[in-house]
Amino acid sequence: MPTRRSIFAWMTCTAIITLIASSAPADEAAKITHSFLVTGGETFIVDAEGKTTWSYPKSTRDGWVLPNGNILLTLSKANDGGSVVEVTRDGKVVFEFKGTQSEVNTAQALENGNIMLTEAGAKPRLLEVTRDGKIVVDVPLQAQTKDHHLQTRMARKLANGNYLVPQLLDKVVREYQPDGKIVWEVATPNWPFTAIRLDNGNTLINCTIGNLTIEVDKQGETVWKISNDDFPSKPFDDACGGQRLPNGNTVITAYHASSGKTKLFEVTRDKQIVWTYTDQRKAGIHHFQILDTNGKAIEGRPLR
């Protein structure tokens, strides 16, 4: 019959083995990898090992890897008025729309086949154009005109058919109907760059030189906020692009960060940094698209 001492020894040994077995997978799970598209002073795709697998010779502001493998890019000041191009992996241009004002700063491929873009200039506007270049939607934007460059950034078409537009110098994010009527807006503490409408109806906003990210509810109340005050490492350095991942984490750019500095970082809801990206390029990352996590492709509509 087992003695009390032998039973205690068996239980202790079992507990130690269980602890070792359970901690090993946790350590392995802690390692996060991503592949992603980068837009900015340099344009490229990085794999999970940090190697460049594709690049484009021009600077860009916004971009998407499309389901067909092509890349949609915004060339801010190309052709004098900016442009949007879709290119194949070997650099062939299969679509181009040339802007008519000062800059084109954002673009989005829509489910109906159209391309949405914004023009900055004396008459700031949001457009939808067909693949043959015909303008089918023209939304005038109520934005300041003193500084064309600081009018708008990452505008996105929403599932309800409206458009969410961050207006930098105006310090406001507005939701426009196709007829130009503003149906929702929220003032921001600093220049808003990225505004992402989440599935729960909240809106995630990166505030560039304010070095903070906020999430607001439908009433415009802040329900989540992170800034350099939350991190000893002070990772925020011009929070431009952002993306909410399926696991609830948020990836944020540090656009002013140059070579050797943290250019992207991923934070959890409870404000833990779980992944960072650094490279030796001088150019900062303006925006990005996370393509996969630990080899698994991001499914559904990218929240960026």
What name fits each language-model region?
Residues 1-5:
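N-terminal secretory signal peptides that target proteins for export/translocation
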Residues 9-21:
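Bacterial N-terminal signal peptides
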Residues 22-26:
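Sec/Tat signal peptide C-region and signal peptidase I cleavage site
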Residues 27-304:
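Histidine-/acidic-rich catalytic cores in large beta-rich domains
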